[in-house]
Amino acid sequence: MGNVIATRMGVLTPSAAIVEIEEPVAQVVNASLKERGFEFAVRPGPAAGCEFLSGIQPWTVGQPLSPMLQRQASALFAFDLLSQNPDRRKEKVNCGLTKEGLVAFDFEMCFGHCFLPIVGGSRAEIWEPSKSGLAARHLFYAEMRAHPPLAGAVQSLIGRLTTEWWNETVCQLPVVWRHDADIIGQNLKAAATYADEFARDVATRCVL
């Protein structure tokens, strides 16, 4: 779901997909995993997948940002703070470059704070991302500190997360995922309600 929300906020991502894993496929995959020494296994049922992007170049930490890349990095910074994603940092960039610009991937830890509060490290409100302590560890913290995101631009990105859009998105999800989606949706609704406060926090306190 993080992938879909990031895309809605203007972040370039591989296209998300729901993949149905049948029992025979799971058996073949798990046998292969076991042969290779892996200790985990896949389960039959719906799973999240995404488009394979060929020709993506690795991101070099500290490389200069063009105006286009600065805008894309700002959108990604705002999304990662909204979702309290701790997994996009200098040691693990989880993004790359294509001809379209900065592409983000790996969203598995997004919104983890909705289910395991310790992940976020704070009982702060969703519109107070500076209190999560994650901003200073973000991949683009130095760039955002040098050129802070515009509060108006961040507020506009949050404004795309409408209740109507989210309800339509949830209707397309497998039933077994909808409970978690409802919890995430409550966070999105709160962020949209306090979009101005969220945007000002991202543009000021998050980049101190």
Which stretches of residues belong to each language-model region?
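C-terminal catalytic region of ATP-dependent kinase domains
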Residues: G101-L208
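Glycine-rich loops and low-complexity Gly/Arg-rich segments
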Residues: R8-V11, F38-V42, Q72-F77, G121-S122, ...
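Surface-exposed beta-strand edges and their flanking turn/coil or helix-capping segments
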Residues: M1, A26-V29, G62-L65, G112, ...
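Surface-exposed loop/turn and secondary-structure junction residues enriched for glycine/proline
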Residues: V4, E22-P24, M68, C114, ...
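Conserved kinase catalytic-core segment
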Residues: I56-L116
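Short, surface-exposed, charge-dense and proline/glycine-enriched linear segments
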Residues: A41-G55, C95, F115-W127
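Conserved ATP-binding subdomain of kinase catalytic cores across diverse folds
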Residues: M1-V61, L82-P86, K99-E100, F107
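Context-gated lysine
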Residues: K34, K90-K92, K99, K131, ...
